[in-house]
Amino acid sequence: MGLVIMPDIFGMRPLFDDLVARLAREWNMVVIAIEPFPNQTLSADIAERMACVSLLSDDAVLRDMHEAADALGVDRVGLMGFCMGGMYCHKAARSDRFARISSFYGMIHIPEGWMSATQGDPLTYLEGGNADRVLAIIGSLDPYTPPDQVLELLGVGVTVQEYPEAVHGFAHDVARPAHRAHDAQDAFSRTRDWLLAQ
């Protein structure tokens, strides 16, 4: 099986190089991660990156995800993403290219500052099909995934795994103050099982 990883808003960096190598080794998959801001030179300043999200195009990001999946050279490909990358996982549910999808704390509705003519609403894409392929990993204290929106996810057929004491970004970066080791281990284990399920 293959796996495409959509990084968080900070994009490709050693954290994701290491994650690709680790999951390829431990999960016995062919794994690739892609840069969400290709052909742009951005600093690590989150305000700068937040301002650039509205300039992204859903169609271009989906094209990049498809090309990454094709580059893996396997028929069955899963998708996993974090934060903004998790939001794009929700948007990718409209595609039949990904057999299973796991979104880690992906936005359910497009944040106001990210709205543009090229940015569709994640929940609308999920309503369009294949929501049953999506596992949403959610921290109950995450302001980007409030309880009323989580209910909307459930309402369109997404499988939700909530972690009651977790905030945004609790699983993929051990350097973050929000990191919760036990919850992260559980979330990755559930994601592996989800991706491998037929």
Question: Can you say where each PLM-predicted feature lies in the sequence?
Answer:
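Serine-hydrolase catalytic machinery in alpha/beta-hydrolase-like enzymes
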Residues: 1-74, 122, 170-172
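Short beta-strand immediately N-terminal to the catalytic nucleophile in serine-hydrolase-like folds
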Residues: 79-81, 104, 137
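Conserved serine/cysteine hydrolase catalytic core
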Residues: 116-133, 189, 193-195
